[in-house]
């Protein structure tokens, strides 16, 4: 999507007046917040691949900022499907007093490179650099920046990247996870099946998933749904797990807000989500979870919104940690 398209999404934020500061508790009074204008820029990359990363920075509506948020977008076409929700949520966070950075990772959106040039490790490095940038920007504007929490906010595969990046960030972080998978393996399998679905029309689907996996294992790129998938990204996604990295203290990730959406009124966490949460809790990390009514906007045919998720997310990161 061109820069004009991204900023165009920014302009149609009719929900912000509705959700405003819904749920922000009296313990966090915000004095007459004024709408902020997002700032688009290119961040020179520190990664070996180099180039620039397109960023959109949302200044907080109040100073000092109540916290800092770095958004980690999902994988492939899910990124495009979720752009509107990411824009709405970023503006809502900024209105609630949080500084927000949206960054297009290597080969994605308006950043340098092609999707096929990306590696999982380079994506993690992009996120780490984004965190350093937003904290440095905050330090320029407030002496209290070090006291405010840093949040990594991921969606789907972005949750897996956020967990890996958290281990490399210079400070302790909190995680806001939207529809987090327990591992990347099913996400890769789902993506490979897009190729199988296309080949079904030509009668060539037999064994296609196994063939694609072998090509990736041999270090080759594969073309799926208009994306050139590199072996480095595929293997990184396939091996990613939503667990703390070995050797990283549990206190490095202080708190996790785990939010899922479902169109079912009686929806609850899946067994694998419950198990993953229990593993984090047993390691000493505070985890709170909610299942919220709303559509799977990252995969719907038409662009959709989940207003209840927007409000729940503002509430979640606005809560003070237990002392």
Task: Please tell me what each predicted stretch does.
Residues 151-162, 179:
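Gly/Ala-rich beta-loop-alpha elbow adjacent to hydrolase catalytic centers
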Residues 60-104:
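Short, surface-exposed "cap/lid" segments of acyl-processing enzymes
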Residues 169-283, 287-314:
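The alpha/beta-hydrolase serine catalytic core
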Residues 164-168:
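Active-site signature of alpha/beta-hydrolase-fold catalytic machinery across serine-
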Residues 108-141, 146:
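Catalytic nucleophile-loop/oxyanion-hole region of alpha/beta-hydrolase
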Residues 1-26:
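Small-residue-biased low-complexity repeat regions
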Residues 32-67:
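N-terminal cap/lid segment of alpha/beta-hydrolase-fold proteins
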Residues 75, 99-109, 181, 293-295:
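Short beta-to-alpha linker loops that shape the active-site pocket of alpha/beta-hydrolase fold enzymes
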């Amino acid at each position: 999507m061109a820069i004009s398209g991204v900023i165009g999404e920014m302009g149609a934020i009719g929900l912000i007046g509705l959700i405003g500061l819904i749920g922000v508790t009296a313990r966090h009074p915000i004095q007459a917040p004024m709408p902020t204008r997002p700032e688009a820029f290119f961040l020179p990359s520190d990664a070996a691949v180099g180039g620039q990363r397109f960023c959109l920075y949302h200044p907080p509506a109040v100073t000092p900022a109540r916290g800092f948020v770095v958004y980690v977008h999902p994988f492939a076409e899910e990124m495009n499907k979720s752009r509107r929700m990411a824009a709405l949520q970023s503006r809502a966070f900024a209105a609630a007093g949080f500084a927000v950075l949206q960054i297009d990772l290597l080969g994605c959106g308006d950043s340098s490179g092609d999707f096929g040039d990306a590696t999982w490790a380079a994506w993690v490095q992009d996120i780490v650099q984004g965190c350093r940038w937003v904290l440095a920007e905050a330090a320029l504007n407030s002496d209290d920046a070090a006291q405010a929490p840093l949040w990594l906010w991921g969606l789907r595969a972005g949750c897996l990247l956020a967990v890996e990046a958290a281990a490399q960030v210079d400070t302790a972080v909190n995680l806001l996870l939207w529809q987090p998978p327990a591992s990347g393996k099913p996400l890769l399998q789902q993506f490979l099946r897009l190729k199988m679905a296309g080949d079904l029309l030509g009668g060539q689907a037999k064994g296609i998933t196994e063939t694609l996996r072998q090509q990736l294992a041999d270090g080759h790129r594969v073309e799926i749904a208009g994306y050139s998938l590199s072996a480095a990204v595929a293997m990184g996604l396939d091996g990613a797990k939503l667990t703390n990295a070995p050797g990283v203290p549990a206190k490095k990730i202080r708190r996790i807000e785990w939010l899922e959406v479902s169109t079912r009124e009686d929806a609850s966490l899946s067994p694998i989500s419950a198990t993953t949460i229990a593993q984090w809790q047993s390691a000493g990390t505070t985890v709170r979870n909610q299942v919220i009514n709303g559509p799977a906007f990252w995969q719907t045919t038409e662009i959709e919104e989940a207003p209840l998720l927007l409000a729940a997310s503002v509430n979640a990161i606005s809560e003070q940690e237990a002392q």
